[in-house]
Every structure is written in C-alpha cells, then in structure tokens.
C-alpha cells in the first residue's frame, strides 16, 4: 500500500495536480445507481457509518451526496499550495479495528463491502455482505452472501435487523 501511495503522490507532483483538482474530478462523479435510495431507507432502522480506506479530503465531495453519514477513514498531508505530500493511515486494519471498537462498547454491527479489504471487518461484524463485489472475490468467500443491487442488500439488512442485541 505504501509503495502504491508513494507512486501516486509522485505522479501527482510530477503532473502538478492539486487536492482541488482531484476534488473537482471526484465532485463530478455520481453515486452508484440505487445507493442514495439505499441510504435513505437503511437510515430508518440503522445508524450508518462509512468505514473506508480512502481519505477524508477525497471523500467529502461524495459525502455531501450521501447527506454526510459518519465517515471513518484516513487523512492526507497537504502542503500550502494544496500539493499532497503524504498521508496518515489510522491503522493497517482500520475497518476491523472500528468494528471491534463498536462491539466493545455494546454496538452490534452489520457490514457491507465490495473487496478483499472488507473481509477483515466481516470477520468481526455480526453479519457481513458483499455488494457489487467482483466474482473473483466473492467466489473465494462463499459463506458471505453477495448481492449485485441495493434492493437485495437492503432486504438482507432488514432480514437480520432483529438479530441485533
């Protein structure tokens, strides 16, 4: 991860890309089809926390489109001229650590994600689901239910909501 991020930062410096440039591009992106409706519906029964391996500074344009659920992620180090100089990772397994912390203070967690780095939180969540995960990933974890649309994911959340203690 460090090598990849160092390479990306080097490319951004070489191409004189600033944080504003990147945020502008991200701001032009739309949420995935069904995501906004999913969030509106899920909030009727659940508190929503986004656990992400992104950075706050990159996520803010999309967070506004989601009505700002709680976001726990990493932080960029940005210089005076908005050049990205580095980053601070909260923890190498931040998603898993966050779920464990919520569990320790009495919360029961239901998690959804789309990649390998989400499987660590599925291990400690009460329930875990893949959403839009590539089959190359979901097929390696056949015990984790996998969904390709937000309506089915919403039904899965509703089906286990009474399991929470």
Task: Tell where the protein language model's regions lie, with residue ranges.
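Short amphipathic alpha-helix with an adjacent loop that forms part of the alpha/beta core around
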Residues: 154-164
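Alpha-helical substrate-recognition element adjacent to the catalytic core
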Residues: 1-75
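Acidic, Mg2+-coordinating phosphoryl-transfer loop and its flanking beta/alpha structural elements
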Residues: 48, 52-53, 107-148
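Short, acidic/turn-prone active-site loops that include or flank metal/cofactor-
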Residues: 71-79, 133-137, 149-153
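Substrate-recognition "cap/lid" segment bordering the active-site pocket of phosphatases
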Residues: 57-109, 140
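Short, well-ordered alpha-helical microsegments
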Residues: 56-60, 118-119, 154
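Alpha-helical segments flanking ligand/cofactor-binding loops in enzyme cores
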Residues: 36, 40, 100, 119-120
């Amino acid at each position: 991860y460090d090598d990849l991020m160092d390479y990306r930062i080097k490319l951004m410096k070489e191409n004189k890309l600033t944080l504003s440039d990147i945020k502008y591009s991200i701001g032009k992106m739309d949420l995935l089809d069904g995501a906004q409706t999913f969030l509106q519906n899920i909030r009727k029964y659940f508190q929503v926390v986004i656990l992400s391996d992104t950075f706050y500074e990159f996520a803010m344009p999309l967070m506004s489109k989601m009505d700002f659920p709680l976001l726990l992620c990493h932080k960029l180090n940005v210089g005076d001229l908005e050049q990205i100089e580095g980053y601070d990772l909260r923890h190498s397994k931040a998603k898993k650590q966050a779920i464990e912390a919520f569990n320790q203070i009495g919360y029961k967690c239901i998690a959804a994600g789309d990649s390998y780095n989400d499987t660590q939180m599925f291990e400690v969540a009460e329930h875990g689901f893949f959403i839009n995960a590539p089959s190359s990933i979901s097929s390696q974890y056949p015990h984790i239910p996998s969904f390709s649309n937000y309506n089915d994911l919403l039904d899965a959340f509703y089906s286990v909501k009474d399991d929470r203690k």
